[in-house]
């Protein structure tokens, strides 16, 4: 069978996607599959690369360009294609895409339209989970605890910033965190200690999205639960992000690889169980399928607050999601195989 590995993308998380794709390429079972590379450039061009039957020798195979003339064709050149040309009979798409235009339902909807099976969550779950505001409103209805928050629209901010300040400061206490509603991997996130910083943080968040969310800052540990399955949902024991900074940013998480993890997290058994139950409930409520990672805050009083649910978590070989499953006895290559089978079962 052919796996179409779709990676790159137009979002700010383009580079994370390339790292994740390389990890998948090195772990997939080539005795069962061939892998067709399809790269989406930062400006949205789709480039069909080589068909691989074995592990690549280096990462350069992923950095595709397209030739304008036959003379320009090089070792890592690809063919520029229209998105619909991705369609193939008896193939499955593995979209290792993060952030907007990747895990927000857009690619998923396109795959549904051309009737191709794909790994991961469907349109509804992807769209809802990508939007931090929508996630919070939906999960409130099933009683999953979350920190207090204030949604802010860019139009309201431009029209009456004073009212936005008053709303935020009337509901929350500094420090707060400001985030774009539709972005991941700590992109566009700021910790804020006063009104002046709040103004700067909102301007930064609105660079990435027309909607932002302001959340109450709390002293807490960060623990994460990995989720796997369609109707039969499984969860891992929590892992913990161990850090010595105010919050870990995009570079720390992916580029510099400076995040320290504790797997499993050192938490009471009842806390671990509660985190697993909340993660499963959130996954089911959002109509999850395939995979997700659910992130929580854990206070010194062992109170859990759901932070977010990621339908396509970082998938590098040093990312939390695969490491959590490895701790449960499911190695990376077998995890990839299970995700492929879950996708095929969903499309039967």
Curated annotation (Swiss-Prot):
PROSITE patterns to which the protein is assigned, alphabetical: ATP_GRASP, DALA_DALA_LIGASE_1, DALA_DALA_LIGASE_2
Matches recorded under Gene3D superfamilies: 3.40.50.20, ATP-grasp fold, A domain, ATP-grasp fold, B domain
Family to which this protein belongs: Belongs to the D-alanine--D-alanine ligase family.
Cofactor: record remark: Binds 2 magnesium or manganese ions per subunit.
Organism: Enterococcus faecalis (strain ATCC 700802 / V583)
Root EC class: ligase
Name of protein: D-alanine--D-alanine ligase
GO biological process: cell wall organization; peptidoglycan biosynthetic process; regulation of cell shape
Domain ATP-grasp: 136-341
Domain of life: Bacteria
Major localization class: cytoplasm
NCBIfam families: D_ala_D_alaTIGR, PRK01966.1-2, PRK01966.1-4, PRK01966.1-5
EC numbers: 6.3.2.4
Catalyzed reaction equations: 2 D-alanine + ATP = D-alanyl-D-alanine + ADP + phosphate + H(+)
Binding site for Mg(2+) 2: 308, 310
Subcellular localization: Cytoplasm
Cofactor: Mg(2+); Mn(2+)
GO molecular function: ATP binding; D-alanine-D-alanine ligase activity; metal ion binding
Pathway entry: Cell wall biogenesis; peptidoglycan biosynthesis
Binding site for Mg(2+) 1: 295, 308
